[in-house]
Amino acid sequence: MAFLWLFSLWLLVPGTQGTKDGDMRLVNGASANEGRVEIFYRGQWGTVCDNLWNILDANVVCRALGYENATQALGRAAFGPGRGPVMLDEVECTGTEPSLANCSSLGWLKSRCGHEKDAGVVCSNETGGVHILDLSGDLPNALGQIFDSQQGCDLFIQVTGQGHGDLTICAHKLILNTNPEAQALWQVVGSSVIMRVDAECMPVVRDFLRYFYSRRIEVTMSSVKCLHKLASAYGATQLQDYCGRLFATLLPQDPTFRTPLELYAYAQATRDSVLEDLCVQFLAWNFEPLTQAEAWLSVPTALLQALLSKSDLAVSSELDLLKAVDQWSMESSASHAEVERLLEQVRFPMVLPQELFELQFNLSLYEGHRELFQRKTMEALEFHTVPFRVLAKYRGLNLTEDTYQPRLYTSSTWSTLVTESSSRSRAAVQVYGYAQYYPYGYDSRRWYYPYQSFQTPQHPSFLFVDKLISWSATYLPTVQSCWNYGFSCTPEELPVLGLTKSSYSEPAIGYENKALMLCGGYSVVDVANFAGSKAPIPSALDTNSSKISSLFPCSSGAFSGFRVVIRPFYLTNSTDLD
C-alpha cells in the first residue's frame, strides 16, 4: 500500500500528466541544451521546418525547456534529419509564447518540407538556477499497471450488462480521489458500487475505468458511442467533450455509413440535438454514396425525411434521388402516408420533361401514388415550358420555394471536379503581350495551378436546355496565382477557389454556387459558398491557426479535390424577366 500511496501523491504534484500536444524536446544534440526541435501532436513526435525560422522562435523552445534563451537558431537539419511528420512550417513567434503551437504558422501537418530542412536550436547553458528532473511521463503507464493488477483494492465495482453477464472490477479510492472526473465513483459510501450499462458497452467498461488511472484512452469508431455514453452518465466531462468533438472526425472514416446511422440513432435516443444535426449534415453532403451502400435500405424514415428537406443535399441529379427513394421504399416498412410525405419533398421541377414522362414506366412507387405523381409532373412541366413572367402572373407561383431550387447536383451537367491533375497539359504565360505555351511542369510554383473549364445550362428549366454558359474554376494557393488568373486575394484568405463565367447569362437568373471539399476521393467534409468569384478553402484538420477548419476533419491532412457546383435560380425581384 505504501507504493500505491507514493504514486497517488505523485499524481497530485503539478505537471505530472503525460505528454500533451505542444510539448517540445531537443533530439540528437551533443549536449542537453542543443538539438533538433521536435514537437508533440496527436500521439506522435514530429519536426519543424526551417522556413522563417529565427532566434525568436528558438527562444520559445529554449525557455519552454528551462533555459534562459537561445543562442542559435539553426536550419538545414543541422542536427541530422528527423523521422515522422513535419508538424509545423513558417513558424513566427514573438518570443513570449509557451510553445511553438501558440505561434503563428501554416498549422499542424500543413508543411511540404522534407526532413533536410528540419529546424534546430542551441540554448544557453544558463537555467537561472532551475534544474528539472521530470519523470512524470512514466506516471500514466505506472498507474495503469496498478489498475491492471487488480490488487490492493478498496472499492469493488459490479458492472451489470442488463442480462448479458456481470463483471466485477476492483479499484483504488485514493487514486480515483485525485481525478475529478471519477467523482461519481470515489464519493460512494462503502466499498462497493453498481454500474448499469448497455450490453453493447460492456467491452469498453474496463478501458473506461482504466482511463481514471492513466488519464489516457484510445477511442475508435466502434467505441466512441459507448465511451461518450459512459462519460455522460458518470460525469467524466473531459472525456465526454473529447468524444463529442471526435464524432465529427470519425464520421468520414466509415465508408459503410454504419457509424453515422448508429450515431444518429444514439443522438435521437439521448436527445442530443447537436449530434443529430451533425449526422444529418454529414449524410446530406454524402447522400450519393449513402444510397449506394448496403446501409441505405436501413435508413429510418424520419432521417430520410430530414435529408430530403435539405437544399445542401449532394446527389448526381434529382432523378437519381427519386430512384434511390424508390429502391428504399421496396425494403422499408414505412406506411403509405409516410411515403407520400417523402415524395412531397422530391423536387420534381428539377427533373427534365422526358425523364418525368418515363417515371410511370420505371418506378415501382408510381402505381401506388399515381395521383401525387401526376400532380407533381404537371407542376414540373409548367415550370419547364412556361416563361417565368407568365408563371408568376397567372399561377402566382412562389419560385423561391425549395421545390424550385436546385440541390447540390454533382453530375457533369452542373458541376466539375478540380484536382491536382485537372488542368491542361500546357500552361499559357503572357510575355510582352503574346501568349507563349510551355509544357506541363514549367515553373509550376508560379504558373501552373489546377483549373477546369466547363459548361452548364443557364437554368434547370427546359427553356434553357440549349443555352449554355461557360465557367472556369481554379485552385489559387498564392497571391501570385490570383494575379495570374485575374483575381484579387490577400495572403490571409488563401488558399481559395476561383470561379468565373465567360459568356452571357439571362439577367433574370442568379447563381448561388458552392464548393465541396473532398477527402479521400469520396467523402464531402465541408461546403463553402462562392462569395462573388471566390470560395474559401478551410483547413483540412483542426489546427491552431486562425483559419477556419472544415466541419468534418480530413484525416489525411489535405483535401483530395474540390467539386464546384453551379446552382441557378430565378431572380424574383428582377425587372428584366423577358
Curated annotation (Swiss-Prot):
Q: Which InterPro entries match?
A: BACK, BTB-POZ/Galectin-3-binding, BTB/POZ_dom, SKP1/BTB/POZ_sf, SRCR, SRCR-like_dom_sf
Ranges for domain SRCR: 24-124
* Signal peptide residue numbers: 1-18
Q: Which GO terms describe its cellular component?
A: extracellular matrix; extracellular space; membrane
Sugar-modified residues: 69, 102, 362, 398
Entry keyword annotation includes Secreted:
yes
- Identify the domain of life: Eukaryota
Alphabetically, which GO biological process terms does the record hold?
Answer: cell adhesion
What does the UniProt function comment say about this protein?
Promotes integrin-mediated cell adhesion. May stimulate host defense against viruses and tumor cells.
| Full protein name | Galectin-3-binding protein
The organism of origin for this protein: Mesocricetus auratus (Golden hamster)
